[in-house]
Amino acid sequence: MQLSDFDYHLPEALIAQHPPAERGASRLLHVDGMTLSDLSFADLPSRLQAGDLLVFNDTRVIRARLFGEKASGGKVEALIERVLDDHTALAHVRASKSPKPGSRLIFAGRWEAEMVERHDSMFKLRFLAEENVYDILEASGKLPLPPYIERSAEHDDDERYQTVYAREQGAVAAPTAGLHFTDAMLATLQAQGIATAFVTLHVGAGTFQPVKVDNVAEHKMHSEIYDIPQATVDAIAAARARGGRVVAVGTTSVRALESAARHGELKAGRGETDIFITPGYRFRVVDRLLTNFHLPKSTLLMLVSAFAGYDEIFQAYRHAVEKEYRFFSYGDAMLLEKKV
């Protein structure tokens, strides 16, 4: 397929720049083949049944953006992509001139780091303070909002750009389908007999990288680290045994689960995945998908087209634009039925 096959018109006014006034006060578009239902997110429990299993991504967004200057002069900005150990990290670095190995960077006027070496488009940084990287980010980092949110991070984002169940540090972007859930909604689902389980996939900045090839099959996917607990594998098996459906909350949960089942049976464990899901892919684990609306020509739009059907998704997106749904990270949600 061609990249142009995944384009659509989106008025800029529909890109949500702020979260809704209250967490969960979003709309929900249910896509069941060509049948569309306009709902509120509060209606989600009515679309699930006892015995179903919701699988959430419990990654936590780190304050990954650091501002500073090179020891030799000139401003520098670093986006920490992956923490390697207590004192080293891979980062995207923006500066008037790329730092050379051995050069020093000083962030927030207090944290010195050495540029060790280059890794493709990223830089390996070694922080020289006694504090570990996570402590440095917590003290001086800024939350890395997506590039289409055209404002700086505000105090409110510290809470609203995290899910209520986030616990495993390491993401530089939120698993946004989960942002709609409140503690009250989770309690309602539990009382209804709907089970929950967790995976971890640390969302990287690559999730926002544009596809630069015309032939989609030639795209090289970014890689991300994931972890599937044995308890989640067991919960999925139990849901299958009782006739329940596996409902992935977000495309990141899909990528983690489908990666862990790439060779057939779903297996627990930690790994790195560059799985690229496009129309024609056969889903092994996920039965239903809760997700937000995705960017034109993006790999995530390709994933949902593979899941719910290309024609079905593009009809749903045209409907969403017409009905003025809110798009992207702070926008509204969709509940997708798998096309079989």
Curated annotation (Swiss-Prot):
Write down the chemical reaction(s) this protein catalyses.
7-aminomethyl-7-carbaguanosine(34) in tRNA + S-adenosyl-L-methionine = epoxyqueuosine(34) in tRNA + adenine + L-methionine + 2 H(+)
GO biological process entries = queuosine biosynthetic process; tRNA wobble guanine modification
The family database entries (Pfam families) matched by this protein are listed as: Queuosine_synth
- EC number(s) recorded for this UniProt protein: 2.4.99.17
The answer to whether keyword Transferase applies is yes
Q: List localization entries.
A: Cytoplasm
User: How would you classify this enzyme at the top EC level?
Assistant: transferase
| Any one GO molecular function term | S-adenosylmethionine:tRNA ribosyltransferase-isomerase activity
**Keywords of this protein's UniProt record, alphabetized?**
Cytoplasm, Queuosine biosynthesis, S-adenosyl-L-methionine, Transferase
> What is the role of this chain?
Transfers and isomerizes the ribose moiety from AdoMet to the 7-aminomethyl group of 7-deazaguanine (preQ1-tRNA) to give epoxyqueuosine (oQ-tRNA).
The UniProt entry's sequence similarity note says:
Belongs to the QueA family.
This protein is called what?
Answer: S-adenosylmethionine:tRNA ribosyltransferase-isomerase
